[in-house]
């Protein structure tokens, strides 16, 4: 289908959103036990039909390989039986988490006796636009259902068969438990026009969350008429302070850069204090070369590393645009900085506000870094790969928000609710 939005597609997507809203009204009244039973049944169904989902995914993988998709994106696209099983286990974990709906955030009595309470309630219809991430379909469905929300999904062409197979498993479970299948729907049948319609559907969709590369995220932020929660691309930094334990730093960097290169919490830039650069850079360059990581370096780093005669090294001069680039590949930018202030200034200038890490033993340096870095997550002597809803104990995540309004960092169940105020009176009137 053409990317251009026709009135017919817009009307169809709005009808789907309205169906989702009506179904969500029923879900919002469901108790925690009913929602947990639903989630456990969905997890069992995913396990039962994992081979069918894998078969659909194999077709998506084959087409994407033929279309030249890079290795990082192919890794995200893969949804084989083990990954389906992991997703199902994530759904079970969501069922064990506290239900945020109905939680009293605060409450107090006014001098006139009026009792005020601020209570957590579902957002309503959450729209999700993402690309080549079939696990997100399961994650979003489970989080939305537990938090009392409906989900309207645009999962992208690359994963269209996989997502359809996954939703085909979830829909009958919803109906078997007395809920409408409209609670979790896809607009993939409309191609990119479906995403455009979602961005236009203000008044039908309550909030829109993009999850993908920087281009996708910025396109949604710029063009959406629906309120957006921005999940950020990850131009993620690790800073090696002069007080850092260099032996500790090497495995942290290798893990952060190479464990999964196509994810937003993978490290992209390495900043090294000048006092330890001569000692540390040849060591880390050798370790990165062994992992087939291409190095984009500033002049000082280049001079130090090039003199070390490291076998298999792919060493290059960094261009200015490198410092703002999320590679999502076996590539890393390296820069020597004069001091902690210079590292913080560089990060706050070039970061996307996702995750940064400091390797240091000096408490004052750690405190300065954690206070001044303007990102959603700051790690100390740990890999940036820990920025993840599952790792944080959320079971799954809607995304990792890099904005400051509503939610910041990994978005779990609580971040998928809003609040309402309820006033309990005994006849009070305002003078």
Swiss-Prot record:
Q: What EC number(s) would the UniProt record show?
A: 1.2.1.41
Q: Which GO terms describe its cellular component?
A: cytoplasm
Name the keywords, alphabetized: Amino-acid biosynthesis, Cytoplasm, NADP, Oxidoreductase, Proline biosynthesis
EC class of the enzyme, as a word: oxidoreductase
Under Gene Ontology molecular function, one entry of this record is: NADP binding
The task this protein performs is described as: Catalyzes the NADPH-dependent reduction of L-glutamate 5-phosphate into L-glutamate 5-semialdehyde and phosphate. The product spontaneously undergoes cyclization to form 1-pyrroline-5-carboxylate.
Q: What name is this protein filed under? A: Gamma-glutamyl phosphate reductase
């Amino acid at each position: 289908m053409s990317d251009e939005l026709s009135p017919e597609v817009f009307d169809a997507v709005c009808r789907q959103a309205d169906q989702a809203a009506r179904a969500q009204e029923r879900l919002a009244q469901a108790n925690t036990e009913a929602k947990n039973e639903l989630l456990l049944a969905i997890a069992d169904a995913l396990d039962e039909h994992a081979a069918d989902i894998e078969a659909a995914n194999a077709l998506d993988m084959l087409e994407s390989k033929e279309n030249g998709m890079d290795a990082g994106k192919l890794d995200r696209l893969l949804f084989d039986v083990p990954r389906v099983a992991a997703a199902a286990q994530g759904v079970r974990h969501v069922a064990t988490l506290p239900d945020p709906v109905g939680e009293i955030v605060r409450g107090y009595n006014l001098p006139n006796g009026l009792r005020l309470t601020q209570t957590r309630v579902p957002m309503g219809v959450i729209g999700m636009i993402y690309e080549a991430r079939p696990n997100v379909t399961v994650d979003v469905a489970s989080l939305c259902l537990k938090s009392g929300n409906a989900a309207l999904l645009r999962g992208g062409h690359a994963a269209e068969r996989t997502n359809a197979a996954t939703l085909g498993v979830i829909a009958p479970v919803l109906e078997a438990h007395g809920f409408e299948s409209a609670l979790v729907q896809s607009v993939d049948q409309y191609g990119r026009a479906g995403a455009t319609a979602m961005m236009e559907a203000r008044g039908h969709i309550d909030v829109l969350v993009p999850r993908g590369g920087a281009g996708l995220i910025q396109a949604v932020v710029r063009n959406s008429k629906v309120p957006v929660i921005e999940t950020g691309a990850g131009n993620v930094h690790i800073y090696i302070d002069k007080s850092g334990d260099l032996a500790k730093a090497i495995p942290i960097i290798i893990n952060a850069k190479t464990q999964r290169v196509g994810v937003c919490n993978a490290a992209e830039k390495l900043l090294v204090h000048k006092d330890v650069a001569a000692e540390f850079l040849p060591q880390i360059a050798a370790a990165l070369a062994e992992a087939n990581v291409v190095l984009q370096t500033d002049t000082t780093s280049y001079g130090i590393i090039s003199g070390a005669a490291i076998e298999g090294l792919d060493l290059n001069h960094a261009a200015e645009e490198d410092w703002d680039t999320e590679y999502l590949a076996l590539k890393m930018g390296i820069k020597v900085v004069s001091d902690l202030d210079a590292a913080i200034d560089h990060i706050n200038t070039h970061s996307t506000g996702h995750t940064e890490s400091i390797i240091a033993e000096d408490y004052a340096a750690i405190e300065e870094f954690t206070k001044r870095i303007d990102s959603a997550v700051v790690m100390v002597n740990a890999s940036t790969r820990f920025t993840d809803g599952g790792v944080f104990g959320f079971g799954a995540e809607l995304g990792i928000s890099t904005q400051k309004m509503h939610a910041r960092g990994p978005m779990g169940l609580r971040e998928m609710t809003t609040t309402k105020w309820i006033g309990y009176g005994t006849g009070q009137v305002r003078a």
